[in-house]
Design a protein with these regions (language model features):
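Short, low-complexity N-terminal intrinsically disordered segments enriched in polar/charged residues
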Residues: 22-54, 66, 234-282, 294, ...
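A solvent-exposed, acidic/Ser-Thr-rich amphipathic alpha-helical stretch
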Residues: 61-135, 289-358, 519-594
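Short beta-strand edge/turn micro-motifs at domain boundaries
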Residues: 128-132, 150-185, 189, 240-244, ...
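N-terminal cap/lid segment of alpha/beta-hydrolase-fold proteins
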Residues: 724-783
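Mobile cap/lid helix-loop segments that gate and shape the active-site cleft of serine hydrolases
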Residues: 747-757, 888-889, 893-926, 932
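Gly/Ser-rich "nucleophile elbow"/oxyanion-hole loop immediately N-terminal to the catalytic nucleophile
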Residues: 783, 849-870
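Short beta-strand/loop motif that positions the catalytic acidic residue
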Residues: 930, 936-938
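C-terminal catalytic histidine-bearing segment of alpha/beta-hydrolase fold enzymes
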Residues: 937, 944-947, 951, 958-1001
Length: 1001
C-alpha cells in the first residue's frame, strides 16, 4: 500500500494511555474495553442524531418516536412535551400534521432537516452524553410558501436498556425566514409601540407546559448555552474520559482482545469511509473528474437520479465528463457539500455502506443559480487495505432555480443522456419533488433495530429495500496470537478514533464561537506558541497576535458577543482529518458556509479551510494553523451567479500589523483559483490536478465580458452602459428592484480590482454603533485631496455603507480613491427608532469630526463634499437646510425627496405621523436658498414620487441664481445611477469629478 492512500485513520498511531506500557497486556484489557466502548458510544450517539434528521426529512414519525427515553423531555418552540407518548403524539399531529400512525409528508411538501456540525461528549460513567448540533431546515409547499430555518440543538442522551436514546432535546432558534427575503431582521416597532402579547401556537396536541427558557436567536443577541467547556482552554473538553472496567468481558484474555480488535477496526473503518465520501465532495466541487473516478473500484458503478447505471471506472469517468469540463472554469460555481454521514461497516469484512446528504449550489455567472438537495446511498469495498466506492447512487430530493426557490420551481429528475447511454436502466423509476419520494435506506432503526416504517406515498418497494440493506457474511474473529501486539494495536486504533472526534469537535466549536463574536474563546482554540491564522489577504498572525488580531480587527477593539440585528453564522462542515504517523499532529480540510445579515440585506459566503492542529503535552488538541481560502461572497437577493463579489479584504496594519504578509494572492468567484489539498488521492495517490487559467487571465476575460457593446441608440444606452444592462433596466422600469438591478451590475464589478486603494474600516465618528465610516485612500502619496462622503439610501429605515458579499457601496469609495479623491461611506442612525432630525444631526457630528481628522487620510478638510442618494440625499438636504455649523465645499443630491407629501409611509417612519409639521420639516424652500454649491441629478427611470421634488429644486435655484449643476441620467433607474459608479458608464461620475474640481460659484 503506497504512502498517502489512507486518508484519516491510517493505523500507525502510537497512542499512550498513561502507564499502559508498564502494565502486562492482561492488565490493560480493562482500560481498553472501556476506551473501545466509549468510542462505540460516541459513534452510536452521532448515528442517532444524524438519522433523526433523515427521519424528520421524510416524515417517518413512527421510527422517530422510538428515539426518546420513557421520561424524555422535548423543549421545542411550540412548548415542552414530556414523556415518550406525548412526544410521539407531538411528532405525528403537530409536526407531521397527520393522524396518529400515518407516516410520510405526501406530495408537494419539503421538510428537510439537516443535523450537522456536532460537538459530542460522553459523560463520566458512559451512561449519558451531550451533543450540540446545528440545524438547517428547508420547509415549504409547492405552489405555496418556502421557508428557511436555522437553530441549535443542545441534546442530552442516555442509555436505556443498553441502547442510546434522547433524554432531553432543547431547540434554540437561530432564525426563521421566508425564502423571498432571506434572513433579514424584521422591521422594528416604533419606540412608543406597545409590544403585542405573545399568543401561544394552537396545537392539535397541546404542549405539557410552556417552553423552557431558550435563546430566541436572530435578530435578538443571545447565545444558546454550551454543554462543553472551551475545547482548547485548560484541560479542554475531552470527547470521553473513562476508567478501566472492573467487570471483565467474558472469555479469556486473547478472546477479549480479539473482540476489541474487531470493534476498534470497525470504528476506524467508519471514519475512513466518512473521509472518503467527504473527499469525493471536495473533488466534485472543482470538477476534478480524474480524481473523482479514482475513488471507485475497477468494477464500481455510478447512478444519478434517472440517468441509469454506468459500470466500471472508465464508464464512471465518461459519465462525469458529461457534467462539465475537467476542472472549474471562470464563472462556474459547483459547490457540493457532503453532510450528515451515516456509515455502516460490516464487522470483520471488507464491506461498508453510507447514507449522506448532498446540498449543492451550482450555476454559471449571469445565469440562474440552482439548488440541489438529495441523498446518496453508497456501497464500499476494501481492497488491499484501501476503501473504494463500489456503487454510488444519488437520489435528488429537489432541483430548483435559486431565483424562485422550492415553492415556485421544481425541475424533474434528469433522465438518460442521449449521447452517452447508460449500461443499465435506472435501478428504480421515481419522480422527485413536488412528488414525494423516499429512497431505500441501508440501515434499520438504530434504537429498535427493526426495519424502518416507510411511507406508503413515495416510499420504496420491498425489492428496493432488500437490495439496499446492509448485509453479508462476516468472517470469524481473527485469533490473537500475541496479546501485547494486539493490545498495542487496539490502543493505537482507539487513540486515532478519539483524536478524530476531538479534532471534529474543535472544528465545530470554532464555527460556533465565530457565530457569536466570541473572540477570546476563539483565540483559546489556538496553541499559544505555535498557533497562526491567515484569513483572506490580511496577512499571517502568530502566537499572541492571533488573539490581538481577532479582538482588534474582528472585534473592532474589544466588542465581544452577538449584536442585535446582526447575523454571522459560520457553518463548519465536511472535515477531512489526516493524522500524522505519531498521532501528535493533524491536518484538516473543511468547508465553511456563511449566512450573514445586517439591516435589510442578507448574504452568503463560502470558504475552504486547510488547517493544522497539534496535541499538546496536556493531551489537548489545539490549532497550530488556521488558513481560510475564501471562495465566494454574494448578496442573498441575487445569489452567487448574479451578485457575487471577487474582492478580498486586505491587512489592517493600523489596528494590528501582521507578522508576515499574505502567503498567497487569491480572488473569489467568479474567478477560480487553486486551493491546495493537504492529501493525495486516498485510493491512487494521484497528486496531479488539471491546470487552471491564471487568475490575471481570468480577470482580463471578465473585464472583456464586461466591456459594453455599442449602444443601439444614445437614448437607450448611455456611453459605457452595456446594451444588456440598458435592456434590463428598461424591463425593470421605475420599480426599485434591488435583486434584478444587482444582477445586472454584479458581473461588471466582479471583474474590477482595486490594488491601488488602501482602506480603513469601521472608524467611529460618534458614540452610537451606527456612527461608523469606511475610508478609501489612494496608496500613492500626494497633496491633500478632496474628500467625498457617500450617504446611502434605504427608505430612512434600512441600508448600510456596505453589504457583505455585495459591491455596493464600496464601489463608490473605490471609484473616488482611483480618481484622486479620498472616498468615504458611512452608516447613520435609522428610523423608526431614530426620527427627524437624527440624520442631519449625524451629518453635523460627522462633518465636525472630518474637519478634525481628514488629514490623517490625506484629505483636505476644507474640501469636504457630501453625496447623498435617495433617503441619503434627503438627510444631506436637511443638514444643509438647517444651517450646518461646519460648512462643506459642496453637495451632490442624487434622486432625493425634498418636499414631503402626507401619504408616504416611509416618510412617516422618519419625519413622524404629524403631517401638519411637514411643511416646516421639508427642506425644499431653504435648500433653494443655501449658498453651498450643489450638483442635483435624477434618473429617467426614477419612481414618479422623486422627480417633481428634483425639478422644483432645480427650477428654484436657477431662478435665484444659486450655484448648481443639474443633470438627468437617460436610461438609468433609482438604483443603477449609484450601482454604475466605478464601471465604464461615466454618466454621473464624470460630471461629479468636474463639479468637485471646480464647484460653480
Amino acid at each position: 500500500m503506497k504512502s498517502g492512500r489512507v486518508l484519516v485513520v491510517a493505523l500507525l498511531l502510537s497512542f499512550s494511555m498513561g502507564g499502559a506500557a508498564a502494565e502486562k497486556p492482561e492488565q490493560r484489557l480493562g482500560q481498553l474495553e472501556a476506551e473501545v466502548e466509549a468510542a462505540a458510544d460516541i459513534s452510536a450517539v452521532m448515528r442517532l442524531q444524524r438519522t433523526y434528521g433523515y427521519f424528520v426529512d421524510k416524515g417517518m414519525w413512527a421510527d422517530l418516536a422510538e428515539y426518546f427515553t420513557t421520561d424524555a423531555v422535548a423543549n421545542y418552540p411550540a412548548g415542552v412535551f414530556i414523556g415518550k407518548p406525548s412526544i410521539r403524539e407531538h411528532l405525528f399531529r403537530n409536526v407531521g400534521n397527520v393522524p396518529m400512525g400515518q407516516v410520510g409528508l405526501g406530495d408537494k411538501r419539503v421538510y428537510n432537516h439537516f443535523s450537522i456540525q456536532p460537538v459530542v461528549n460522553l459523560d463520566p460513567g458512559g451512561q449519558t452524553a451531550k451533543g450540540r448540533w446545528r440545524v438547517i431546515a428547508m420547509f415549504g409547499n409547492f405552489g405555496g410558501s418556502a421557508t428557511w430555518a436555522e437553530g441549535l440543538y443542545e441534546m442530552q442522551y442516555a442509555k436505556e436498556g443498553g441502547v442510546w436514546k434522547i433524554a432531553r432535546l432543547d431547540y434554540h432558534s437561530g432564525f426563521g425566514a421566508p425564502y423571498a427575503t432571506g434572513w433579514v431582521a424584521p422591521p422594528q416597532p416604533a419606540v412608543s409601540a406597545v409590544p403585542a402579547p405573545r399568543r401561544p401556537r394552537q396545537l392539535a396536541h397541546p404542549a405539557d407546559r410552556e417552553r423552557d427558557a431558550s435563546c430566541e436567536g436572530f435578530p435578538a443577541a443571545c447565545i444558546a448555552p454550551f454543554h462543553y467547556a472551551n475545547p482548547g482552554k485548560g484541560a479542554g473538553s475531552p470527547v470521553w474520559t473513562v476508567t478501566a472496567k472492573t467487570s471483565p468481558a467474558s472469555g479469556d484474555a486473547k478472546q477479549r482482545a480479539a473482540k476489541l480488535l474487531s470493534k476498534a477496526r470497525q470504528l476506524a473503518d467508519e471514519q475512513q469511509v466518512e473521509s472518503l465520501l467527504r473527499t469525493y465532495g471536495f473533488y466534485l466541487d472543482r470538477a476534478y473528474w480524474d480524481q473523482v473516478s479514482d475513488l471507485f473500484a475497477d468494477d464500481g458503478t455510478i447512478e444519478f437520479a434517472q440517468q441509469g447505471v454506468y459500470v466500471g471506472k472508465k464508464r464512471v469517468r465518461e459519465f462525469l465528463g458529461k457534467l462539465g469540463p475537467h476542472g472549474l472554469v471562470t464563472g462556474w460555481m459547483n459547490d457540493h457539500m457532503q453532510l450528515q454521514p451515516v456509515v455502516t461497516v460490516l464487522p470483520d469484512s471488507n464491506k461498508a455502506w453510507s447514507h449522506n446528504r448532498e446540498w449543492a449550489m451550482t450555476g454559471r455567472l449571469g445565469e440562474a443559480g440552482q439548488w440541489t438537495e438529495g441523498i446518496y446511498e453508497n456501497q464500499y469495498v476494501k481492497q488491499g487495505g484501501v476503501w473504494k466506492i463500489k456503487s454510488m447512487h444519488f437520489y435528488p430530493t429537489f432541483i430548483t432555480d435559486y431565483d424562485q426557490g422550492w415553492a415556485k420551481d421544481a425541475k424533474p429528475a434528469p433522465g438518460p443522456l442521449a449521447d452517452l447511454p447508460p449500461d443499465r436502466p435506472p435501478s428504480s423509476v421515481y419522480a422527485i419533488y413536488p412528488k414525494a419520494h423516499v429512497p431505500p435506506y441501508h440501515y434499520n432503526n438504530p434504537v429498535t433495530l427493526k426495519p424502518l416504517q416507510y411511507p406508503t406515498v413515495g416510499g420504496p418497494s420491498a425489492r428496493e429495500i432488500a437490495q439496499a440493506q446492509a448485509s453479508g457474511e462476516t468472517k470469524s474473529l481473527e485469533p490473537v496470537r500475541d496479546l501485547k501486539v494486539a493490545a498495542d494495536e487496539i490502543e493505537r486504533l482507539v487513540g486515532r478514533v478519539k483524536a478524530v472526534h476531538e479534532i471534529e469537535n474543535l472544528s465545530s466549536a470554532y464555527g460556533y464561537y465565530l457565530d457569536k463574536n466570541l473572540w477570546n474563546d476563539l483565540a483559546d482554540l489556538f496553541d499559544p506558541q505555535l498557533g497562526s491564522i491567515e484569513l483572506a489577504h490580511r496577512g499571517v498572525y502568530r502566537g499572541p497576535k492571533v488573539r490581538e488580531f481577532l479582538v482588534k480587527v474582528f472585534g473592532r477593539g474589544g466588542q465581544e458577543g452577538p449584536v442585535a440585528g446582526r447575523l454571522g453564522n459560520h457553518i463548519q462542515v465536511q472535515p477531512v482529518i489526516t493524522l500524522s504517523a505519531d498521532g501528535k499532529s493533524a491536518k484538516i480540510r473543511s468547508r465553511m458556509l456563511q449566512q450573514m445579515s445586517q439591516g435589510a440585506r442578507a448574504s452568503w459566503g463560502g470558504a475552504i479551510y486547510e488547517n493544522e492542529a497539534v496535541r499538546g503535552a496536556d493531551g489537548v488538541w489545539r490549532y497550530s494553523k488556521v488558513n481560510a481560502w475564501n471562495t465566494f461572497t454574494a448578496s442573498y437577493d441575487g445569489g452567487w451567479t448574479k451578485a457575487a463579489s471577487s474582492g478580498m479584504p486586505g491587512p489592517n496594519p493600523e489596528l494590528v500589523a501582521p507578522d508576515s504578509p499574505p502567503t498567497r494572492t487569491i480572488a473569489m468567484y467568479p474567478v477560480v483559483y487553486e486551493i491546495p489539498y493537504h492529501y493525495a488521492n486516498p485510493v491512487t495517490g494521484r497528486n496531479s490536478l488539471p491546470p487552471l487559467i491564471p487568475m490575471a487571465a481570468q480577470q482580463a476575460q471578465l473585464r472583456a465580458q464586461a466591456t459594453p457593446a455599442a449602444p443601439t441608440s444614445p437614448a437607450s444606452a448611455p456611453p459605457g452602459m452595456p446594451a444588456s444592462v440598458a435592456a434590463g433596466l428598461r424591463e425593470i422600469g421605475a420599480k426599485i428592484d434591488a435583486a434584478k438591478t444587482t444582477a445586472l451590475y454584479a458581473p461588471l464589478h466582479a471583474a474590477l480590482q482595486h490594488d491601488a486603494v488602501a482602506t480603513r474600516r469601521d472608524l467611529a465618528y460618534g458614540p452610537h454603533e451606527r456612527h461608523r465610516a469606511d475610508v478609501f485612500m489612494p496608496k500613492a502619496p500626494g497633496a491633500p485631496r478632496p474628500l467625498v462622503v457617500f450617504v446611502h439610501g434605504g427608505g430612512f429605515s434600512r441600508g448600510a455603507k456596505s453589504s457583505a458579499g455585495q459591491f455596493y457601496y464600496d464601489n463608490i469609495g473605490y471609484w473616488a480613491a482611483e480618481h484622486g479623491l479620498v472616498g468615504m461611506t458611512i452608516n447613520y442612525r435609522l428610523a423608526p427608532e431614530f426620527k427627524y432630525p437624527a440624520g442631519a444631526e449625524d451629518l453635523d457630528r460627522l462633518v465636525a469630526w472630518l474637519r478634525e481628522h481628514a488629514r490623517e487620510w490625506g484629505a483636505d478638510p476644507a474640501r469636504i463634499f457630501l453625496w447623498g442618494h435617495s433617503a441619503g440625499a434627503a438627510h444631506v438636504a436637511d443638514y444643509l437646510a438647517r444651517g450646518p455649523k461646519a460648512p462643506v465645499a459642496g453637495a451632490i443630491l442624487t434622486s432625493g425627496v425634498y418636499q414631503l407629501g402626507d401619504t408616504v409611509s416611509v416618510w412617516k417612519d422618519y419625519y413622524g405621523e404629524d403631517v401638519a409639521l411637514y411643511p416646516q420639516r421639508a427642506s425644499l424652500t431653504r435648500l433653494i436658498q443655501v449658498s453651498v454649491p450643489l450638483l442635483v441629478n435624477w434618473a429617467e427611470l426614477d419612481p414618479p414620487d422623486f422627480i417633481p421634488d428634483t425639478e422644483k429644486l432645480i427650477a428654484g435655484r436657477k431662478a435665484g441664481g444659486k450655484p448648481m449643476v443639474s443633470l438627468r441620467l437617460p436610461n438609468h433607474s433609482h438604483l443603477s445611477e449609484t450601482y454604475a459608479v466605478g464601471t465604464a458608464d461615466q454618466s454621473l461620475t464624470s460630471p461629479i469629478l468636474k463639479f468637485i474640481e471646480a464647484p460653480p460659484k
